Structures are given as C-alpha cells and as structure tokens.
C-alpha cells in the first residue's frame, strides 16, 4: 500500500530512539521514550492559500526533521512500519 499525503501533510518515518542512557544503562519500554526525529517519506503538493494559489512545502522527501507530535498527528501502520502523518506546521526544524 502507498500513501500520498494531501495539501500540506507530510508522511514521516520515526527514527529509532537511543536505547542507552548517558551512563550506559539500557533503557526499555516507556523509559526509552519515542523519538521526535524522523525521515520524510512523502509530501503533499502544498498549502492552499486564501487566493487559491498553492504554496509548496519547505520540506522534501529524504529530509530528516524534528517534529512536534501534537493533537493533529496521525499514526499509520503500513506493513511493518509505523508512519506519522503530520501537517508541515508540526515540523519544528530540518536537520542539516
């Protein structure tokens, strides 16, 4: 199955979180937490402005991003991968 985001939506594959603490202790389960970094796997065409024009997104496929998993974030499981469907405004930064 393939997902094609609409408008200003972005599909992100969450990166694995580091499973060791700074002191070398292996973290498991909820102690490890969830990463707020991921790789953009698909994007919509852009945000529709009030005048009807489409503003292209600032992110592109392959970008590593830091995101805020807020109220509007949707989690989708495709095959064995867990993907997040976010709006571009949920993305806080592009990691360069």
From Swiss-Prot:
<dbReference type="Pfam" id="PF00166">
    <property type="entry name" value="Cpn10"/>
</dbReference>
<dbReference type="GO" id="GO:0044183">
    <property type="term" value="F:protein folding chaperone"/>
</dbReference>
<protein>
    <recommendedName>
        <fullName>Co-chaperonin GroES</fullName>
    </recommendedName>
</protein>
<dbReference type="InterPro" id="IPR037124">
    <property type="entry name" value="Chaperonin_GroES_sf"/>
</dbReference>
<dbReference type="GO" id="GO:0051085">
    <property type="term" value="P:chaperone cofactor-dependent protein refolding"/>
</dbReference>
<keyword id="KW-0963">Cytoplasm</keyword>
<dbReference type="GO" id="GO:0046872">
    <property type="term" value="F:metal ion binding"/>
</dbReference>
<dbReference type="InterPro" id="IPR020818">
    <property type="entry name" value="Chaperonin_GroES"/>
</dbReference>
<dbReference type="GO" id="GO:0051087">
    <property type="term" value="F:protein-folding chaperone binding"/>
</dbReference>
<dbReference type="GO" id="GO:0051082">
    <property type="term" value="F:unfolded protein binding"/>
</dbReference>
<dbReference type="InterPro" id="IPR011032">
    <property type="entry name" value="GroES-like_sf"/>
</dbReference>
<dbReference type="GO" id="GO:0005737">
    <property type="term" value="C:cytoplasm"/>
</dbReference>
<dbReference type="GO" id="GO:0005524">
    <property type="term" value="F:ATP binding"/>
</dbReference>
<dbReference type="InterPro" id="IPR018369">
    <property type="entry name" value="Chaprnonin_Cpn10_CS"/>
</dbReference>
<keyword id="KW-0143">Chaperone</keyword>
<comment type="similarity">
    <text>Belongs to the GroES chaperonin family.</text>
</comment>
<comment type="subunit">
    <text>Heptamer of 7 subunits arranged in a ring. Interacts with the chaperonin GroEL.</text>
</comment>
<comment type="function">
    <text>Together with the chaperonin GroEL, plays an essential role in assisting protein folding. The GroEL-GroES system forms a nano-cage that allows encapsulation of the non-native substrate proteins and provides a physical environment optimized to promote and accelerate protein folding. GroES binds to the apical surface of the GroEL ring, thereby capping the opening of the GroEL channel.</text>
</comment>
């Amino acid at each position: 199955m393939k997902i094609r985001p609409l408008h200003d939506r972005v599909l992100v594959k969450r990166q694995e979180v580091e499973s060791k603490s700074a002191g070398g202790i292996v973290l498991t389960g909820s102690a490890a937490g969830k990463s707020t970094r991921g790789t953009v796997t698909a994007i919509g065409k852009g945000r529709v402005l009030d005048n009807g024009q489409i503003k292209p997104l600032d992110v592109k496929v392959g970008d590593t991003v830091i995101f805020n998993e807020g109220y509007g974030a949707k989690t989708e499981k495709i095959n064995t991968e867990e993907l997040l469907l976010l709006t571009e405004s949920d993305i806080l930064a592009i990691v360069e």
